[in-house]
């Protein structure tokens, strides 16, 4: 906790090609070693493939893919009398986006295709069609929250 009051949120500039803040956040998460140009090229290639295969506007297709991965519930550990319970909690909208971006990128990196652009486009296309590793991660998170509904009264 900061001693000098709440920390202000830093805003990100919209990306130059589509004018989307969400795309900029994705590119920043994708970036390695400060190489933003490389990350942008990979991302734009992947989004073009996604738009081509989905037959929809690139921005809308990307937003739909992110929307399909956003979790609504998650579990957080809560210690009560020596026992730790997994308490289901609603996920704040900002955290939903953060988790969705993280899961998509991690699952894309874990895929077997050759080249990051192909991996990313494959994962985005799977997310667009409500399947794939990132959507499975979301469903697992929801399943955990559902299984621990009995501890919902420990919410704080």
From Swiss-Prot:
Q: Note whether rRNA-binding occurs among the keywords.
A: yes
Q: Which UniProt keywords apply?
A: Ribonucleoprotein, Ribosomal protein, RNA-binding, rRNA-binding, tRNA-binding
Q: SUPFAM superfamilies from the xrefs?
A: Ribosomal protein S7
- Tagged with keyword tRNA-binding: yes
Q: How does it assemble?
A: Part of the 30S ribosomal subunit. Contacts proteins S9 and S11.
Q: Which Gene3D superfamilies match?
A: Ribosomal protein S7 domain
Gene Ontology molecular-function annotations: rRNA binding; structural constituent of ribosome; tRNA binding
Q: Can you quote a single GO CC term?
A: small ribosomal subunit
According to the lineage, what is the superkingdom? Bacteria
Main function: One of the primary rRNA binding proteins, it binds directly to 16S rRNA where it nucleates assembly of the head domain of the 30S subunit. Is located at the subunit interface close to the decoding center, probably blocks exit of the E-site tRNA.
Q: Which organism is it from?
A: Solidesulfovibrio magneticus (strain ATCC 700980 / DSM 13731 / RS-1)
Q: Which family does it belong to?
A: Belongs to the universal ribosomal protein uS7 family.
Its protein name is Small ribosomal subunit protein uS7
Q: Give GO BP annotations, semicolon-separated.
A: translation
Q: Which PROSITE patterns match?
A: RIBOSOMAL_S7
Q: What CDD domains does this protein map onto?
A: uS7_Bacteria (cd14869)
